[in-house]
């Protein structure tokens, strides 16, 4: 089959998704409700997913894919896990939302507190953005200070104060920040290079009595996977404590994914506040922030820092989260680690055989593919990689029935549901994908 025939066949295979995308673009800005889903970084039409089970996705055209995105992290047990589906159905049968306290809220909060030792109180919210926004407000209210330190390439949701030089979709689209963020808001945000503890010391030297908090991803995964240098998070803890500022560790991505206790189980730094999302709600919309009782009890109704949400603690989302966490046992985390090891080996072998420079950094069972010979340690080195190799690599995998992240700056996620057949498909797809990356032309990026 010639290249034109392949293009025609692929167009036919995506015809239903293409129609759905056109329909979506008529009513939704860009046709998507989160920018990275539009395939801007890789080109082409995004498949419209109609079903998922285990480690496999099905799109509107009937194509099947091995899922290496896992809804951007939360689906650690795979899609439609029977215990999670049963818990959701049972909760939904009793009512979808009450706007009142429910037992499941306290049960999920207690489960999370039992896993992360420094967390003494939890407040449930609806999204990771809401969690980080609320944690920042609480830090300012607790300290009486205004400035927040964040790191270039770390993404903490689309909070105005935290969008400056952020990762995730902001990096994918090549945006330095976002219009609509006022100068006054930006002025209270200090953006520093990631993994540069000397820069943090200098910021405290200049602004120490004005800094309310330092916020960092526990192990960043929104500029690709860029783990903290050994001791970096602990040094942040020491500096914030010395200057009366709070440390906020964002575990929205890593929380309860990379271990039973999230990144805290790997690098146990006692932050003042943590934010959580994704895994804790089993794929439904819920998130949380929590920390020391002394700090958390400044929240209304106990204290003056206001935070509220009509759907916070939604009983159906709580049921999904509880079922997910209760089935995420030691065997599940061992399987996640083994599957990440297996995927990383397959990726590295294929890229090595094709002569493609690459790094595959890991944060527990999270990983990334960077096209470079040089280790990536911060946002600058992530952006300096050969990202133009990624679109042909991505599309070769997608065409072969493997669904990887649609940006070089996003994380690859595994689930416990990956089986030998799935890995066989990945292994069969990778040589051609690696050759496509090897033959990529920077001028066509």
Swiss-Prot record:
Subunit structure: Homodimer.
Domain of life: Bacteria
Matches recorded under Pfam families: Aminotran_3
Single GO cellular component term: cytoplasm
Residue list for modification N6-(pyridoxal phosphate)lysine: 278
Single biological process term from Gene Ontology: protoporphyrinogen IX biosynthetic process
GO MF: glutamate-1-semialdehyde 2,1-aminomutase activity; pyridoxal phosphate binding; transaminase activity
Entry's family note: Belongs to the class-III pyridoxal-phosphate-dependent aminotransferase family. HemL subfamily.
UniProt enzyme class: isomerase
Cofactor: pyridoxal 5'-phosphate
Locations listed in the record: Cytoplasm
CDD domains: OAT_like (cd00610)
Pathway: Porphyrin-containing compound metabolism; protoporphyrin-IX biosynthesis; 5-aminolevulinate from L-glutamyl-tRNA(Glu): step 2/2
Keywords for the protein's UniProt record, in alphabetical order: Cytoplasm, Isomerase, Porphyrin biosynthesis, Pyridoxal phosphate
Major localization listed first in the record, in broad terms: cytoplasm
Reactions performed catalytically: (S)-4-amino-5-oxopentanoate = 5-aminolevulinate
Taxonomy of the source species: Bacteria, Bacillati, Actinomycetota, Actinomycetes, Mycobacteriales
Enzyme Commission number(s): 5.4.3.8
Official protein name in the record: Glutamate-1-semialdehyde 2,1-aminomutase
Source organism per UniProt: Mycolicibacterium paratuberculosis (strain ATCC BAA-968 / K-10) (Mycobacterium paratuberculosis)
